[in-house]
Amino acid sequence: MTIAVKESKILYGNFDKAKSGIMKGSGGIVEQGPGLQQRIITPAKEMPPEIPHVEFNQLPLSVLIRNLTVYAAKELSQYMKTNVRSTQDASTRKMEFLRLIIFLRNQFLRLYVLVKWCKTIRQNNFHTMIDLLNWFRGTNIIVNNCLLALKDMSTSMAGAKLPNPDLITALEVLMLGRPDLPTHGFLLTGDENGQQANKIPAKLILKRFRDLNTCLSVKISLMDLPAEMHTYSIKDGRITFTVFPEFEISLSTIDRESPLFFVDVKFLFNENKFPLNTTKIALLVNDILYKSPTPLLSLYQFLHRYVLTLQLYMIHVELQDIETNGKYSGGNLAHHYDPKKNIISLRYWLQSKMNSKCKALIGVEKTSQSIILQWHLPDTKEEGKTTKYNNLLGNIEAILDEITFNHARIIMSELLDTGLFEGDDNKNDTSDTLFFHVPVICVATAPVQLKINTISGIFYFKNPSALLLSYAKQLNQTSDLDDVVNILERLRMDKIVHILRNMFEKTGWICEDVVKLNKPILYDKHKDKKRILTRDLFIRIKDWPANWFFILNLVASGATCIVEKLIGKVQSVKGTWEVKYLDQGNLQVSKLESITYQNVMHMQKTIIQKILNHMIIDSLNELKISKVICQGEASQKLPAYVQTNTAGASNVSIIAIGLESFLQGSKALSDTLESTIFLKMDYEQNEVKLFGKFKKDTQMIRYQCDDLLINFIDKRGLAFHMTEDFTSLNHVVQYLTKFRQKLMQLVVLTDVTEKLHNNFRSEHFQIVKLRPNEISFRYLKNSKDDQDCTIQIVTNETKIEKLQVQLSPLNPQNIIQKYLECDKYDPHFIFNYLHFTSKLFSAVKSIESITNTNTMTITLHLHTLAAYQLSYHDRLTGGQIALCIDLRNSPSRAGSMYHLYFAQEDYSASKNPMYPAILQVINNVFMLNNNTKRKVPSVIRLGTGVACPLGDIEPLLEEIHSILIRS
């Protein structure tokens, strides 16, 4: 071991040249004799160096056993989990499990052997063995590194094919620093003071150079030269080819039969920026010159490709420097170098959304075999046009500046062609500024300067405001120039909206920001037109009715803006704003320049009338009511009773309303009121009136009902009006509903009173109380009650639901009340029935009041509205008589008649004590051949009964009753 160490130190030691025969090293003294033999003299008492002590990467035995146990348990558990549902057969799984057990056993066994081995060491000093093992490993690494270095040297020198003398010379240079040339008097020791040998004469050297020049001239003249290598020079035994601006290569040869070999190469574009591996180049060049049948042509092709590859790599390095430290740093430029394809893909303006069009390609052009940069022009008018740039090396940054500038100019030119911008007339063609005019007031505009940053491709405004900054951000988020134009037009529209909002808000208007429709009102009208923007501005005054707005429809195209003024109603339905009403009949169109503060203030005073008109019209539309606004010539055709009340009044609006649609087609309309009513709004008096007129004189006119708010106008009392004062604009529509309800009540009351008078044609009929929903009247003869009947008119907000007839408890017809409550009968039938049956019930009541004593009881029973039974009961004798009274239609006579007859059981009951009375009535009243004088001439005798008209029922009942009582 000691000898090996000493030899290595001698090999790499520093030699002392003080004595020619002795070399000194750090580990001993080497004596050198004439035969170059060496003998090592080792000092007698030299101690070996201490082994370095190792203290890191050591664990206690307990921790090592614990870790190994945990590892073994996890491995077994993981194996069990992963092999539960394995598709392998049982034998394969068993073998895998056995291998796992053996592996874990070996780990524990190694630990056991290590523990046993440590016990055999004296004093348990096993740390010395660990230190020794570490030293062996370090030494082994050094030796391995030397072997690897020698292997690399052998590999790199494999192509040199040097003869053995050259290898010996190389070994001499390696050991001594220079070759040992005995022929020139050089010694292996490097001693320069030795005896000098004879040198080669200079004439011989020059003669050899001349011979080589002649040989090269002859050799080159016999070889095929590529056109690029026709420029060459032969000097000092070598031929130098200059291919400008690529390379300069020197070749030489030994004789005419030997091939050319590499001497030196110089790249004319490199300027020593990159270290070149000339050794590898020499190997490749010599291989080409030796093997190729056309060596110079192959050499040029190889060097040309090598130059192109090297130049492309240098461009790649230059781009990296520009991206990192140049003006395009900060993520504005990126490139991808593909060494296999020799292509560099270049992308600029990465921060711009237009980066998909910002591309360039650097590669080798096939036709010229030179490196070019190919830039596809992003001009939509000239698709497929490209620009090529040469001489890239060292000029790539200037070329990028030119590309970005031209790209910015193209974008500016395309924007200028849209007609939305103006160029800078005061500067030359290199100006990068466009002027975009935006309004500052309705009648004036100001230019805004739009520019493009040629480094980043970002649009920006000069001296921007907050609004311009927000729109600059939008401009840089789009890649389409059409979108850029649309964004700038939206900028102009926003400025217009800002100006109008400012004007209206300063004059007391309120601009609603909450109201936002899904699409502008005029969107469908202009959606097929290009470069037309529409915007809605919803404006109102604080005291206006809710949901009603003065709407400004802005239509902008280029520098022109048209303002359409509308009145509409907008409501929120399930979170979505919808237009419920829009006045497009009175559309007012004006230019933006015509809107002034005076116009805005004037509209504030005059528009309230239109708002209320349209609010009423909208309410009428919701109710599906026909209407016409009376203005212009239509106002001159109003009826006299309407014109009289509106003559000389200002700020008055009149709306003609169809009565039938207003009252939803009531049957009483055709005979009661005129078909048209008029609604008048007086905005100065804050008064709303409804005018109407009866078609003819009716009974209703003679009655006074204060609750109906009716005021008659003319002397005949046919025209009338209803009046309400309003204090809030929101309540105007409520008054319209109130008028509708009162008018409906008026029509119903008129219809009901007419029907009552037509049905109760007697001097006893009298209306005693008249209210909008109630009519009380008397119609019975000798009635002592305040009212015999009360009619309740049941209505809802829009129509009359039903009429409820309530008979007085003292009314003898109260027995039919249950039939009147079933809602099956028409009011006309009820009134007619009450009238023609009133005498029957009055007669029965009179008979009951006179006859009902302790001995005789008379009771009226009602089977149906057309079948009655008058029962007599004698309490003394127990006799009973049932007189049936039926109301039947008479085919021979118009109208109905009463049929009176006794019940069938009364004829067969011969033991009935009152049977003689029945026979007497039959003989005197019912028999056909009875010649007695009739008390009621209109009576028709039927044998088993009798029939009489409705008006003669009272004397007939009295006659029959008198016979039955006397008997």
Curated annotation (Swiss-Prot):
One GO location term (cellular component): core mediator complex
Coiled-coil stretches: none
InterPro entries, per database record: Med14_N, Mediator_Med14
Cystine pairings recorded for this chain: none
Annotated compartments: Nucleus
GO terms (BP aspect): negative regulation of transcription by RNA polymerase II; positive regulation of transcription elongation by RNA polymerase II; positive regulation of transcription initiation by RNA polymerase II; regulation of transcription by RNA polymerase II; RNA polymerase II preinitiation complex assembly
Transcription recorded as keyword: yes
Presence of the UniProt keyword Transcription regulation in the record: yes
Matches recorded under Pfam families: Med14
Keywords: Activator, Nucleus, Transcription, Transcription regulation
GO molecular function, one term: RNA polymerase II-specific DNA-binding transcription factor binding
Function: Component of the Mediator complex, a coactivator involved in the regulated transcription of nearly all RNA polymerase II-dependent genes. Mediator functions as a bridge to convey information from gene-specific regulatory proteins to the basal RNA polymerase II transcription machinery. Mediator is recruited to promoters by direct interactions with regulatory proteins and serves as a scaffold for the assembly of a functional preinitiation complex with RNA polymerase II and the general transcription factors.
Family statement: Belongs to the Mediator complex subunit 14 family.
Assembly: Component of the Mediator complex.
Protein name: Mediator of RNA polymerase II transcription subunit 14
Organism: Eremothecium gossypii (strain ATCC 10895 / CBS 109.51 / FGSC 9923 / NRRL Y-1056)
Encoding gene (name): RGR1
